[in-house]
Amino acid sequence: MMYYFPFKFYNLYSLACESRRISFKKIKGMNKDILYIGIDPGVSGGIAILNNDGSVKDVVAMPETPRDILDFLSLYKEDSRCVIEDVGHGIPGQSSKATATFARHNGQLEMALLALDIPTEKVTPQKWIKVYQLKRKKEQDKNEWKNVLKAKAQSLFPQLGKKVTLKTCDALLISEYARRTKF
């Protein structure tokens, strides 16, 4: 059941009374100033934060430690939505040690998002890339494909200049995907 108080929506269950003091907890999603977080998991990935209007709030290469990840994401936990790339079981051709490292790092990201109560959706690379109408050619190697993605990110965010790197381009495109689909 929704209740309307001047200019804000509140849920009846979010009203809390403590010794004559009433606090109202704002429902997520009712604020128009939503932040969209895009995460390209992995040690060589990145995190991008976009405002609702498409302007870039922040973009960084992947923080190194779990504490750094948590500290960075906690800056943007209010009224945010996150889309994280669902790579599945790792990257084909990697050693078992590299796959385990990737899985551990991915778990750290997911736990940080869970601890901060940030609504999160996993999306496959095929799904978010389809929004940009890009197709990988069979003769393209990984570096050539990453350069295509980097060029697309640079065309969407020309104001960033050198901040669009091979580490951050996927995160920027994923956060723009989240903004466009209004997750």
Please tell me what each predicted stretch does.
Residues M1-M2:
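Methionine residue identity
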Residues F5-F183:
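Phosphate- and other anionic-substrate recognition elements at nucleic-acid/protein interfaces
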